[in-house]
Every structure is written in structure tokens, then in C-alpha cells.
Amino acid sequence: MLRAALTIVFLFAGFATCHAGDAKKGEDVAIEHCRRCHVIPGQNNMGIGISPSIKAMIQSKATDWRHKFEVFYALRPHPSFVIIREFRTRPEFPLGITPVIIAVDDLDHLMAYVDLLAQELRK
């Protein structure tokens, strides 16, 4: 219930769209947390299963590709293992999945990194 409420607040209050992040710190966040499932340009060549690469998501023809990055923590499967530190949301973890615990600032840094990659990849 709390997770759903936070998701709604973040989505409709514009939380995810006010970026003042550091792209290098965002790359570090992606390397630490995202590459276990997704391919990060210049970092790893393999992700898991059907997890799309960061490059493929950025180069997507979908018009909402950036919004999906902004709210990734609310999109499946992320709510089952991503915790926003400041809000201490604690999802029910499936067996064998280590939680990803990130700070609100990490979200801004991650978006700065995505925006930097997009400048190159979406030319």
C-alpha cells in the first residue's frame, strides 16, 4: 500500500523530472546496480534473460522511452526489489533476489547519465 502511494506521488508530483544529477555518478549507479540485469554501454556485454540493454532502451522508437527511465523503480519487475532509501519501502523479495537500495539523489544522477548517453545514441 505504501509503495503504491509513493509511486503515485512520484509520478504525479513531477518528482522524477527535476534532474540536477551528475552523469559520472549516474554511470557509477548503473554499473553498481543495473548491470546485473542490463547491458551498460562500455561496461558489460551480457545482461540476463530478456532484460533490454540501456542502449536499446534509449534508442527505442517508443515516445515514452525517457519517462520509463524516470520511473523505472515503479515499473515491473523493479518494484519487487528496488528500495528508495529515504522512503524505506520494503517490497516482498522473491527468493534469491538481492535488493537494490538507492537514494533519491541516485535517481537524478542516473537520469543525468541516461541523458548523456542519449545525446550520443539518439543522433
Sequence positions of predicted segments:
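Bacterial N-terminal signal peptides
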Residues: 4-14
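Electrostatic cytochrome c docking/interface patches
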Residues: 14-29
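Gly/Gly-Pro-rich "capping" loops immediately C-terminal to redox-active cysteine motifs
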Residues: 27, 42-72
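The canonical Cys-X-X-Cys-His
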Residues: 30-41, 110
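Protein kinase-like catalytic domain
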Residues: 37-38, 77, 118
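Long, charge-enriched, surface-exposed interaction segments in small proteins/subunits
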Residues: 65-80, 85
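C-terminal capping alpha-helices of c-type cytochrome domains
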Residues: 87-123
